[in-house]
Curated annotation (Swiss-Prot):
Residues 183-212 are annotated as: Activation loop. This is CBL-interacting serine/threonine-protein kinase 25. Keywords: ATP-binding, Kinase, Manganese, Nucleotide-binding, Phosphoprotein, Serine/threonine-protein kinase, Transferase. SMART domains: S_TKc. The modification Phosphoserine is found at S187. It comes from Arabidopsis thaliana.
Amino acid sequence: MGSKLKLYPLLNHSSVFHPDSRYQSAPTMEEEQQQLRVLFAKYEMGRLLGKGTFGKVYYGKEITTGESVAIKIINKDQVKREGMMEQIKREISIMRLVRHPNIVELKEVMATKTKIFFIMEYVKGGELFSKIVKGKLKEDSARKYFQQLISAVDFCHSRGVSHRDLKPENLLVDENGDLKVSDFGLSALPEQILQDGLLHTQCGTPAYVAPEVLRKKGYDGAKGDIWSCGIILYVLLAGFLPFQDENLMKMYRKIFKSEFEYPPWFSPESKRLISKLLVVDPNKRISIPAIMRTPWFRKNINSPIEFKIDELEIQNVEDETPTTTATTATTTTTPVSPKFFNAFEFISSMSSGFDLSSLFESKRKLRSMFTSRWSASEIMGKLEGIGKEMNMKVKRTKDFKVKLFGKTEGRKGQIAVTAEVFEVAPEVAVVELCKSAGDTLEYNRLYEEHVRPALEEIVWSWHGDNHNNNIVKSNGNYVSDENSGSDC
């Protein structure tokens, strides 16, 4: 069996060095003094740690205790536009009550007229998965982390809250070597910038997501979490993913059929447990109580974990600017557990979808991909409509492939754009765009100024936007190192 296994890298660089910098090194004294502000007369807010679509993350300290915290700031207007303010308040109310040693603590929630402030535990140890990026863990170490993961997930499930985005970026390790699950109650911000200044999308890759979630049908979030725990356990023991393929459609098919192989070093007991975790039918998937009864899980398990539940206090602050004179009014919200739609789904509904960029690596540079929740037929209609609006000649070469031709000759002849639609699952389509003829600079101008803006209505998430890596806009002009006439 071992010779048949194709081993793909566990994580790319952007996954290992997670952009949500709650657990990165604390800023130096000089850096803090340069950017220090005071938030609500309670927290010193230092340098910017991360930046995303919905807001920013800052390093901070509580003034009275000196405790390090991470301060996540979200734009309230974006929440209101989705009509989900009350929904996220209820979910936060639940998570504010949670105190579990294996969950990153949401310490406090405050709000002004325009912003929501989440005061989070600052975890120093780093990502669990950075420990295994060069190889698998020993079985006893993997078991310890899996036990702590299941304990955290079970605790929140018992309170009606599912994570729905369990993945390597959300598994941290504190200075004592214990697991901390982040973003329970707050879904990870979909796009954040690392310290290298590059944008890295961090929404859940399909490699960790349950089949029923990918199909976008009604699903039980708790059962989806169990599937993700199975993927995580496999990776802890193997050092690589069970479902991975250079071809996106093949990977989807593997997930939908749960087609994978076990490395030869997996013990019979671990294989037995994983086979029950990675079951396609969620109704036949093993439950958490059953997981906890398995011999493999129970080996070397510690005493039951003690935890506490605190009273909720959410502050609504009327001042728009954090200062030392901010006035606070405290209100108490009764925790309610939404049955079908909670904060994770809420954030996901506003997020940019799955980050599939690592799956689309290609030598053909001028190509882009995006996922869409529109049907393939609707997408084709939209593409043809865009071509006509841009006064281009439209030619459908296949049922789900279309070419758009410029009507005038450019510097290197007539420009042509090819678009092809792949329906990988019900309500999930992948669209590939590329330059098939013409000048590179003219194509990039057409793409950036006309094609991409016109597509935003149907785009769930952009992926593998590789043409931007080779083209820079300077003084209003596009400059490229590309000389080829065709890239698809």
